[in-house]
Amino acid sequence: MIIIIGASKGIGKFLLHKFRSESITVVGTFNSASDNSDNLFKVDVTDFNQITAFIETQKPLLSEITLINCAGITYNAFAHKSDPALWKNVIDVNLIGTYNCIRAVLPLMRLQKFGRIINFSSVVATKPTAGVSAYAASKSALWGMSKSLAQENAGLNITINNINLGYSELGMIKKVPQEFLDTLIGQIPSKKLCEPIDIYKTVNYLMECNYINGSSIDLNGGLV
């Protein structure tokens, strides 16, 4: 069973449709934006009680669980002009929300002695970019958290890994002005954005491989 957190748009929606097209059982969540044509479950990842309630409703179906954490937001502002509440909200969604989802499924994974957890980090976690301190902090923190959790659970056939995504054709990039996008692509050694199918292949690889654990895979076209 695959659980995709944040499946109403972007990477999460693409993965949801891709897995379903292959007749794989997958459930997804949304929070703020969905017409619910994909039969998603409304869950606020910052609310641990909502997460546990959602997992409880799915419990009869949950075996050989893969949890894919795609929910994420950003807030662009220079620190000296930033709104502390909006800055904190990025941490709450991207980091605390990911923790909440992992925390909710780990007991069941440990009981079943199987689990695959895949988190989406970002190239901005290591590549300095002005104006995205909240996003960079949230994605950097995923690295340390995932490594620690991998140590705790590796002996029970549970793997926890990150995909450090560069700039892809999905999600937030669609809001970027074309002129800026052209400049951005010019800075990527492969001279193109990441294609959705490459994200799927990387996710699938981490699902199938049981010896990669506590790792962060760079999927960035050579952008370092």
Predicted regions and their residues:
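N-terminal Rossmann NAD(P)H-binding glycine-rich loop of SDR-like oxidoreductase domains
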Residues: 8, 16
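Conserved NAD(P)H cofactor-binding loop of Rossmann-fold oxidoreductase domains
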Residues: 70-76, 222
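Substrate-binding pocket helix/loop in short-chain dehydrogenase/reductase
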Residues: 78-79, 83-91, 173, 184
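Active-site helix of classical SDR
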Residues: 102, 138, 146
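Alpha-helical segment proximal to the catalytic Tyr-Lys
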Residues: 107, 151-155
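Residue(s) in the substrate-gating loop at a strand-loop-helix junction
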Residues: 122
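C-terminal substrate-recognition "lid" of short-chain dehydrogenase/reductases
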Residues: 192-219
